[in-house]
């Protein structure tokens, strides 16, 4: 109730402010005109974030990410317009606004020259664009351009993000996978492509895998640390917007090729990229297409230890692991963008991007399990692999795609844009296999003098090397299929007033579906002695004198990936097959519909002080189906569909003080939300009766 009351009072204040501005408007606006155009440099590269200022009206705008600007609701007449951009000489020009019509006026800026010194700045053009966008934005933002990303050997967009202040990342095999804004969890920030939220291929969370998208497919990275009313509200940490390449002002052809070498895999890497863009039909139709391919064989050495404390307060290692990974990651990405200028007042756009990542992984792991203070433990030796059609490795295939159709329209003083999009993310893990051997009651001497590198050495009669004393602990195969799909439609309206004030309002509908299906089987050989004989005859030695944590650790001998992958597990004359029902309990089917609307008012309080007030309302409807697991019967079944709905009122207030051209002071108050993880919403039930 308090939340509704706060939102109501905020809306009253908002309405009063807007009404005051509207009262200042002339009743007749049909005779007023509009000027729109694009800011470019001498090479016909667009300049986003340029400042365009009409001196007579004491009002200004900034060019958008494609360099476009618009002034509407202008009285007919002649105006002096000033255009400025960091690193370029400012331009002052006169324009004449026709009554009831739209004037198209592109502006060309030239790079500035100081003291007759010739400065070669081609490598920093995108960086200047990013600085201008940060400088002129109302909120607190960081913008990274393509040329800034290109300075570093970043294979994916996550690695590029880690170079932005306030962003830290979570790694997987040395590559940045999840981004965290201002120290919050990865699922508390939103990741969007061209303003559309990216669905997640993760099973139980809303985290978006940033390592799916190659860095060279993105034109600009925008990190909004303050979420405004016209942005999705589920972004407590902030919003990361990835802007794909836009159609150029002139023909563009670019190709890149690169390579590298990984010392763990001892293999070469390959990076390829291509971009083509041009304009056709008297510059009415713009097109750009891009493709990227990366193949990166790599690996890692790993030691992991779990420390415990006994009853006397003495610390000891309870779990001791040595791991050797071999990983090959292949990325393919394709994007296209089209824009069609129907006339000065109407424009249609299309953008699409498809990303595919194949991740082949083999892991060899030696574990001292349940290690006690006296050095007693069970030795476990495990190989992770896959079937021959997947290179005998665990294949994780993740895909994301986003296709958006949109339009921009100008009706007198009122401008409108709309977007309809389809997005999908998926993860497949076919035939993921684990073979695990164990040997109980082994004794080890533990050297705990170095807490970072504790070391276990076998006592006489004990071993941690696979031999005929070991027995099969576990042989499993898993199939995983996760899909998330989004259908979105949004529309936004913008109405300019006098003195640079603007009213923006709009609505959005998002229909989300997510399904997780995991199938898990355990296999028991009918002749275990023959199976162990075959296993010991098909081993691989992973001993490596260059083991990076310290060469005193050695991974040892394991069942080979080729042997593990070749096992005919579905042959009933060789193996007994059992479906593990408990593993199916995490499956679910989710349906979400989020309907939202917002009001946002931008007001110039003085020449140097700007105020933005806004209110966003989001209505969320949920329908989830989980699984019930009966431990006594060892059966899994679907639950009834559970429904729920809730409404959130999200006010925002931003202030910007332009002390001078190079000094800006910003302040903000915003309210955002975090949607629960899928695992927290799924109606799962575990049943087990205790008999006394």
Q: What is the predicted function of each stretch?
A:
Residues 158-197:
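Extracytoplasmic beta-strand/coil segments of soluble accessory domains associated
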Residues 103-107, 157-160, 177-180, 192, ...:
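N-terminal periplasmic accessory domains that precede
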Residues 267-367, 398-405, 412, 651-653:
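Transmembrane beta-barrel wall of Gram-negative outer-membrane proteins
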Residues 253-261, 272-274, 289-295, 350-356, ...:
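Transmembrane beta-barrel strands of outer-membrane/channel proteins
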Residues 24-32, 36-45, 50-55, 84-88, ...:
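Short, acidic, small-residue-rich periplasmic hinge/interaction motif at the N-terminus
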Residues 72, 197-225:
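Short acidic/polar hinge/loop motifs at secondary-structure boundaries
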């Amino acid at each position: 109730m308090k939340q509704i009351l706060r939102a109501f009072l905020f809306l009253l204040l908002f309405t009063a402010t807007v009404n005051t501005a509207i009262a200042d408007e002339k009743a007749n606006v049909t005779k007023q005109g509009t000027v729109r155009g694009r800011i470019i440099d001498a090479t016909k590269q667009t300049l986003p974030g340029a400042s365009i200022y009409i001196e007579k009206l004491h009002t200004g705008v900034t060019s958008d990410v494609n360099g476009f600007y618009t002034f509407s609701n202008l009285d007919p007449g002649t105006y002096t317009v000033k255009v400025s951009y960091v690193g370029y000489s400012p331009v002052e020009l006169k324009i004449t606004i026709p009554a009831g019509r739209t004037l198209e006026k592109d502006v060309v800026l030239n790079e500035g020259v100081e003291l007759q010194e010739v400065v070669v700045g081609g490598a920093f053009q995108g960086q200047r664009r990013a600085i201008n966008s940060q400088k002129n934005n109302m909120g607190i933002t960081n913008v990274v351009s393509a040329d800034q990303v290109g300075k570093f050997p970043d294979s994916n967009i996550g690695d590029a993000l880690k170079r932005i202040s306030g962003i830290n990342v979570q790694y997987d095999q040395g590559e940045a996978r999840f981004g965290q804004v201002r120290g919050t969890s990865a699922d508390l920030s939103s990741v969007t492509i061209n303003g559309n939220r990216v669905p997640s291929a993760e099973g139980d969370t809303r985290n978006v895998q940033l390592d799916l998208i190659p860095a060279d497919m993105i034109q600009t990275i925008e990190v909004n640390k303050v979420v405004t009313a016209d942005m999705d509200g589920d972004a407590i940490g902030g919003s990361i917007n990835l802007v794909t390449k836009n159609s150029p002002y002139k023909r563009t052809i670019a190709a890149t090729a690169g390579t590298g070498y990984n010392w763990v895999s001892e293999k070469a890497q390959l990076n390829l990229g291509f971009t083509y863009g041009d304009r056709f039909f008297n510059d009415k139709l713009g097109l750009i297409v891009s493709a990227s391919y990366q193949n990166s064989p790599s690996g890692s050495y790993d030691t992991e230890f779990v420390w415990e404390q006994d009853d006397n307060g003495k610390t000891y290692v309870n779990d001791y692991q040595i791991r050797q990974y071999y990983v090959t990651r292949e990325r393919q990405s394709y994007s296209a963008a089209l824009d069609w200028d129907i006339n000065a007042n109407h424009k249609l756009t299309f953008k699409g991007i498809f990303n595919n990542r194949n991740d082949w992984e083999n892991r060899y792991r030696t574990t001292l399990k349940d290690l006690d203070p006296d050095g007693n433990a069970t030795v476990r030796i495990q190989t992770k692999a896959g079937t021959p059609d997947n290179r005998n490795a665990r294949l994780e295939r993740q895909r994301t795609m986003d296709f958006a159709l949109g339009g921009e329209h100008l009706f007198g003083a009122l401008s409108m844009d709309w977007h309809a999009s389809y997005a999908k993310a998926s993860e497949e893990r076919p035939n993921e296999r684990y073979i695990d051997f164990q040997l109980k009651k082994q004794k080890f001497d533990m050297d705990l003098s170095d807490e970072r590198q504790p070391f276990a050495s076998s006592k006489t009669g004990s071993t941690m090397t696979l031999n005929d004393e070991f027995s099969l602990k576990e042989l499993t195969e898993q199939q995983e299929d996760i899909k998330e799909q989004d259908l979105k439609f949004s529309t936004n309206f913008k109405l300019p007033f006098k003195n640079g004030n603007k009213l923006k309002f709009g609505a959005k509908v998002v229909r989300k579906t997510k399904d997780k299906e995991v199938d898990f089987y355990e296999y028991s050989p009918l002749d275990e002695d023959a199976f162990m004989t075959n296993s010991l005859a098909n081993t691989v030695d992973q001993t490596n004198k260059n083991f990076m944590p310290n060469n005193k650790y050695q991974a040892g001998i394991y069942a080979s990936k080729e042997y593990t992958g070749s096992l005919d597990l579905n042959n009933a004359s060789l193996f007994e097959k059992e479906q593990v029902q408990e593993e199916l309990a995490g499956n679910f089917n989710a349906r979400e519909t989020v309907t939202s609307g917002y009001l946002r008012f931008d007001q110039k309080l003085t020449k140097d002080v700007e105020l933005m007030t806004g209110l966003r309302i989001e209505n969320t409807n949920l329908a989830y189906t989980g699984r019930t697991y009966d431990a006594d019967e060892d059966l899994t079944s679907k639950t009834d569909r559970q429904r729920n709905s809730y409404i959130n009122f999200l006010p925002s207030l931003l202030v910007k003080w332009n002390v001078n051209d190079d000094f800006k002071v910003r302040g903000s108050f915003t309210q955002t939300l975090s949607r629960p993880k899928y695992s927290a919403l799924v109606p799962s039930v575990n049943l087990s009766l205790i008999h006394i």
